[in-house]
Amino acid sequence: MTVNILTGFEKINTIINGCITAEMVENGILADVETFVNTYYEEGQVEEPVVWITQHPTTVSKGADISKTLLLKTPFEFDCGVYEVEIEDANTSSQNLCNRVILSILKNWQTIQNTELEGKRMIRNIELDRYMPMGYVPVTGKSDKVPITGVILNVYHMINWQQCCQQINNGD
């Protein structure tokens, strides 16, 4: 069973964020992560290791008719940084963190989806779009820089427009 637009657009971000936070526990894949930023702008101090998530615009993957079920694509970008004294070590550590983020998504998305949607299936597939050592950001108060590695994962999910219209017509 698919979900309607009211649920689908709200839950996609919750599910993907949940995949990361589920592993930011003792003995988790991301236990060492100090900061998880899930907004576009962070005003506070960012401690590393850091994972920064950005949800990009959702587009129709195929079939743009809004009178039926749509397959949508929502790209999520994860930018990961780890400080090490040696820049080569920091680069390797940032790439390792990025790899563990991918693993966290793959490990948890089905379980979290089942919990959030009470057994309904919304996410159909998650694919790697691109993996990129993006560059460096300066460290406040130091001449050092932290290498950042990024990955974009495309999350394909279904929305049932008809179900939404039926619920509105029925007053649900």
Residue ranges and their predicted role:
Residues 1-43, 56-172:
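Charged, amphipathic alpha-helical segments and their flanking helix caps
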Residues 45-47:
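A short, polar/charged loop/turn motif at coil->beta-strand junctions and beta-hairpin connectors
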